[in-house]
Curated annotation (Swiss-Prot):
Known function: A cognate anti-sigma factor for alternative sigma factor SigF. Alternative sigma factors are held in an inactive form by an anti-sigma factor. Binds ATP and GTP, may hydrolyze both.
Composition-biased stretches (Polar residues): 7-16
Family in the record: Belongs to the anti-sigma-factor family.
UniProt-annotated stretches for the region Disordered: 1-31
Domain of life: Bacteria
Name of the protein: Anti-sigma-F factor RsbW
Annotated keywords: ATP-binding, Hydrolase, Nucleotide-binding, Transcription, Transcription regulation
Subunit structure: Homodimer. Interacts with cognate RNA polymerase sigma factor SigF with a possible 2:1 RbsW:SigF stoichiometry; this inhibits the interaction of SigF with the RNA polymerase catalytic core. Interacts with anti-sigma-F factor antagonist RsfA with a possible 2:1 RbsW:RsfA stoichiometry; this blocks binding to SigF, thus indirectly activating transcription. Interacts with GTPase Obg.
Record remark: domains: The cytosolic domain interacts with sigma factor SigF.
């Protein structure tokens, strides 16, 4: 069974809801027509606050390895902390939080998603939205098009940090 993924900024793609925890397959990522890079890293963890340090560390390590400047790495870590905290607080019990860090030539794209009981995890105009747009060069949200219910609905946030040489 597939549902339509509603990308709030870019049309949509399909999501295979039969995957465990309602996770999306690689081909279902809202990459705006781009394929995931060969250096992309995906980490799936229980949607619990105890896992925030691990997620921040992963993003910080990849950002540093990718030669983002110190401030850009710090901003990206803070943005990921905010995104993941919001997702964890809205996640269904026993949900899995999925984090994908995709280094590209001119940017690092981070996508976080989880099965949530609401689509109002991060709403444009909210305090969290302002924090995220101050920390990342681009912020987008997406969900799988289903209304949140007992089974939840996949909600995600994509952050983009551009390299200093490419107009940061």
């Amino acid at each position: 069974m597939t549902d339509q993924l509603e990308d709030q900024t870019q049309g949509g793609s399909t999501v295979d809801r039969s995957l465990p925890g309602g996770c999306m397959a690689d081909s279902d990522l809202p990459t705006k027509g781009r394929q995931r890079g060969v250096r992309a890293v995906e980490l799936n963890v229980a949607a619990r606050l105890e896992n925030l340090a691990l997620l921040r560390t992963l993003v910080g390590a990849i950002g540093t390895f990718e030669d983002l400047d110190f401030d850009a790495v710090a901003d990206l870590r803070l943005a990921v902390d905010e995104v993941c905290t919001r997702l964890i607080r809205s996640a269904l019990p026993d949900a899995t939080l999925r984090l994908v860090v995709d280094p590209r030539k001119d940017e690092v794209v981070v996508e976080a998603s989880a099965a949530c009981d609401t689509h109002d995890v991060v709403a444009p105009g909210s305090f969290s939205w302002h924090v995220l747009t101050a920390l990342a060069d681009d912020v987008q949200t997406f969900h799988d098009g289903r209304q949140p219910d007992v089974a939840g609905s996949v909600f995600g946030i994509t952050l983009t940090a551009r390299r200093a040489a490419s107009s940061r």
